[in-house]
Amino acid sequence: MRAAEVAPLQIAMFCNPRFDHGPADWHRDITSCREGPLEGLFTDFIANPPAYVQWNIALFDDDVLWLLPGSHRRFNTDAENKQLSISENKPLDGGIPIELKAGDGVVYMNTILHWASNYSTKLRRTLQFVYRAFGNGILPHVHWYTWQPEVIDRLPATLAARFEHFLELKQHERDLMEQIFRAIINKDKEMFHKNLATLHSGQEGRMTCLVLLSKQAWKLRLHPNDPMRDRFTERERELLWQRFVHLDGLLQTHSPQLVPGFQNKEPTRYIFNEMPDFDVNDFVASWDS
């Protein structure tokens, strides 16, 4: 990941159900309304170091997971969309089972098409570790912790100190986001460009970072428990969102659509695949439109 720091986003275990639930759906762990168009995500991690990875480590033999190699770097093909439109819970042409023996692991990105092929009663205990980078100049499309700070009190002292440090890393990132948002609110172009380049140093993919920031600005308005919400007044939150309205409109179509293989299960106006013909300078210019 070429990062100064790496922190766990999630620590979990996959276990077999008590009853046979059969296969799940082929999917990428993203939605168009939450992470933005797929093109932005794969453009970013092709051009820059990866900022997010998932590990599955099997404690017992596990062949539940299937992957479609290379699909994290491209759109679905027409043939794949046709097959997925018929059924999202059958083997997909080109998909391969990941046959883990006890002690084996597989590392992958959650934007790849993958499938839990059979939730049966066969014993399954597979650890999942999800990591994100800090300090490699990329904002990952998943950048929030699923673990709660209260867990630190239950950890050994040395491990608790590490998790306290992880919270500090996230706090510093929120501080930087706040500086970016305040520059947008105040139409301070110089500070905006400077701080955005700090958050996402790669020129390629910086627009993807801006799309992710637009999603954060949306959450500030509507999610009362967002950890950054209290940093801004209600007027500031509304003004910030107004700066993003034009970009948000470009990320939508006139009528709802649904592309198979995403976590979206209902049609949405938010575009699944292509990024708009719009760059960071266009975004700055839109503040006065």
Q: What residue ranges belong to the model's regions?
A:
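Non-heme Fe(II) oxygenase catalytic core, chiefly the N-lobe of the double-stranded beta-helix
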Residues: 1-102, 115-122, 129-143, 225, ...
